From Swiss-Prot:
Protein name: NADH-quinone oxidoreductase subunit C/D
Lineage: Bacteria, Pseudomonadati, Pseudomonadota, Gammaproteobacteria, Enterobacterales
SUPFAM superfamilies: HydB/Nqo4-like (SSF56762), Nqo5-like (SSF143243)
Keyword hit for Transport: yes
Matches recorded under InterPro entries: NADH_DH_suC (IPR010218), NADH_DH_suCD (IPR023062), NADH_Q_OxRdtase_suD (IPR001135), NADH_quin_OxRdtase_su_C/D-like (IPR037232), NADH_UbQ_OxRdtase_30kDa_su (IPR001268), NADH_UbQ_OxRdtase_49kDa_CS (IPR014029), NADH_UbQ_OxRdtase_CS (IPR020396), NDH1_su_D/H (IPR022885)
Main EC class the enzyme belongs to: translocase
Keyword Transmembrane: no
Stretches for region NADH dehydrogenase I subunit C: 1-193
Keyword terms: Cell inner membrane, Cell membrane, Membrane, Multifunctional enzyme, NAD, Quinone, Translocase, Transport, Ubiquinone
Renumbered residue ranges of the record's region NADH dehydrogenase I subunit D: 217-603
Main function: NDH-1 shuttles electrons from NADH, via FMN and iron-sulfur (Fe-S) centers, to quinones in the respiratory chain. The immediate electron acceptor for the enzyme in this species is believed to be ubiquinone. Couples the redox reaction to proton translocation (for every two electrons transferred, four hydrogen ions are translocated across the cytoplasmic membrane), and thus conserves the redox energy in a proton gradient.
Subcellular location: Cell inner membrane
Length: 603
């Protein structure tokens, strides 16, 4: 029975239409009804801005295949994960479920998404694997099985991915402890140490690999988890025939901190500092999707000044991250000097960020409904000095290193893939745009007032190789400088917080005049604001690709479920598909061109 839920709260009245109900009338809903019948689905009303459709488990693959072959198809599996529904109280009109799995599909041609959900009983946690339709479902299904115990039948290798192989239990279940103090004290006996070492020993047969061919044995090489070219605690096992990579297995999880589980134990406000540490180079960029998603739940419209301030800080951190990426890529190819120059330039950005926010790498400065405080005196002078400094420095990187024939020879045509492969593996950011697909969320789905800025989206010519990816990042720095110039010239006047009951913390000045305001301030700071029961979603163009938060509120001071989708996770999953048949030296250049940090992968 089609059930368009109508129990959204009264606060929907203050939300823009695109944030509330228009997704219920998305054309894809009609296409699905025409194909599968009017009674096949439950359509859920949310504040995600995305059609959310509950499908029967038996129809999942058929529906996915239908969406993949529409005239304007849903060509990317953007995200896939699960939820423990057992303690959720606000489920009016939803199918009965102990657990659920969601599939977030994206259409470039439509510039629209759809989310499919499957309800599961605790006694039958089985669902067919989506890898038959999208290869990047592999890692997502492994993580979902690991975190919830949901089995994906037909999966090629359903095993742990974030946790050690010997780990017991499923951490994102509601009955699983969230704090270390809830566990017994950890002791490492000699026997346990030997067991852990044995579990980490790579066995080719477990991954469908052969130890040799008819004439010779293959060599298996551990690259990482402490190799400098691995860019973090990242291990990749290489199957080698001489210098040629026959196959490889990326091994992640060494940096896993349980960021999504933490979201269930922190208030909506106190979780903001954790967002900075998911991708520790992005700073305020990481805070943007989270606070926007919470503001959708709350029904908050922030002042224009807040939007521009947020854009300004985000673009400063984008440049900061790109400079590190460009310089370390050059270093990976063999040139040492540029990385030291880049740290000089990045120091200027940190000085500016510190002057505005009080912190450097992890400001935790965005707030629900605004920012922590207004811009300080002299911010415009510091920004102007940086804008005068940076363009010439960027030109020097291009002239001295990126036009070097040796660097070009090492990177042009290396680790190349086309648009079809990029979409199949969930690639976003510069890696996707290098294939010729013009998709930047700041342009395609503007947020925080990006529609009011003039800037271009650098796009490649059809094939994404190492050199194209790094040169696009250079051009993105130039466009970020353009945006910053507009912030400098056109910073609006006005408040730095929204006048809304759920703005957190609320304006403190009023606490001196009204006891009710003082009580509200105390409760919101100590316990946190209570968000209406609903779901919200926000994606942004982060430094390394598309980053998003999918939040579920059950009418509490804390999130019921916090899903963090990061770009680096699918980018590393793509490595074997791209690098097979290449040399080890090509892999080093490829890793340098991806632009990832392991905290972004492992969360």
């Amino acid at each position: 029975m089609v059930n368009n839920m109508t129990d959204l709260t009264a606060q929907d009245a203050v939300l823009p239409v695109w944030q509330t109900r228009d997704h219920l009338d998305d054309p894809v809903i009609g296409e699905l009804r025409n194909r599968f019948g009017p009674d096949a689905f439950t359509v859920q009303a949310t504040r995600t801005g995305v059609p959310v459709v509950w499908v029967k488990r038996e129809q999942l693959l058929e529906v996915g295949e239908f969406l993949r072959k529409l005239p304007k198809p849903y060509v990317m599996l953007y995200d896939l994960h699960g939820m423990d529904e057992r303690l959720r109280t606000h489920r009016n009109g939803l199918p009965a479920a102990d657990f659920s799995v969601f599939y977030h599909l994206l259409s470039i041609d439509r510039n629209r998404d759809i989310m499919l959900k499957v309800a599961l009983s605790e006694n039958d946690l089985n669902v067919p694997t989506f890898t038959r339709l999208f290869p990047n479902a592999n890692w997502y299904e492994r993580e979902t099985w690991e975190m919830f115990g949901i089995t994906f039948t037909g999966h090629p290798n359903l095993r742990r991915i974030m946790m050690p192989p010997t780990w017991e239990g499923h951490p994102l279940r509601k009955d699983y402890p969230a704090r270390a103090t809830e566990f017994d004290p950890f002791t490492l006996t000699k026997q346990k140490e030997e067991l852990e070492m044995e579990a980490l020993t790579f066995k080719p047969e477990e991954w469908g690999m052969k130890r040799g061919n008819d004439t010779e044995d293959f060599m298996f090489l551990n690259l990482g988890p402490n190799h400098p070219s691995a860019h973090g605690a990242f291990r990749i096992i290489l199957q080698l025939d001489g210098e040629e990579i026959v196959d490889c297995v990326p091994d992640i999880g060494y940096h896993h901190r349980g960021a999504e589980k933490m979201g269930e134990r922190q208030s909506w406000h106190s979780y903001i500092p954790y967002t900075d540490r998911v991708e520790y180079l992005g700073g305020c960029v990481n805070e943007m999707p989270y606070v926007l998603a919470v503001e959708k739940l709350a029904g908050i419209q922030v002042p224009e000044r807040v939007e521009v301030i947020r854009v300004m800080l985000s673009e400063l951190f984008r440049i900061n991250s790109h400079l590190l990426y460009i310089s370390t890529f050059i270093q990976d190819v063999g040139a040492m000097t540029p990385v030291f120059f880049a740290f000089t330039d990045r120091q200027k950005i940190y000085d500016l960020v510190e002057a505005i926010t009080g912190f450097r790498m992890h400001p935790a400065w965005f707030r629900i409904g605004g920012v922590a405080h207004d811009l300080p005196r002299g911010w415009d002078r510091l920004l102007k000095e940086f804008l005068e400094w940076m363009p010439k420095r960027l030109d020097s990187y291009v002239k001295a290193a990126l036009k070097n024939t040796i660097l070009k020879g090492r990177s042009q045509g290396v680790a190349a893939y086309d648009a079809k492969e990029a979409l199949a593996w969930g690639t976003t950011g510069a890696g996707l745009r290098a294939t010729g697909i013009d998709f930047d969320v700041r342009k395609a789905r503007p947020y925080s007032g990006y529609q009011n800025f003039e800037f271009e989206v650098p796009v490649g010519g059809g094939i994404s190789d190492c050199y194209t990816r790094v040169m696009l990042k250079v051009e993105e720095v130039r466009q970020s400088l353009r945006i910053l110039e507009q912030c400098l010239k056109n910073m609006p006047e006005g408040p730095f917080k929204a006048d809304h009951p759920l703005t957190t913390p609320p304006p403190k000045e009023r606490t001196l005049q009204h006891i009710e305001t003082l009580i509200t301030h105390f409760l919101q700071v100590s316990w946190g604001p209570v968000m209406p029961a609903n779901e919200s979603f926000q994606m942004i163009e982060a430094t390394k690709g598309i980053n998003s938060y999918y939040l579920t509120s059950d009418g509490s001071t804390m999130s019921y479920r916090t899903r963090v989708r990061t770009p680096s996770f699918p980018h590393l999953q793509q490595i074997p598909s791209v690098i097979r048949g290449s040399l080890v030296s090509d892999l080093i250049v490829y890793l340098g061109s991806i632009d990832f940090v392991m905290s972004d992968v492992d969360r």
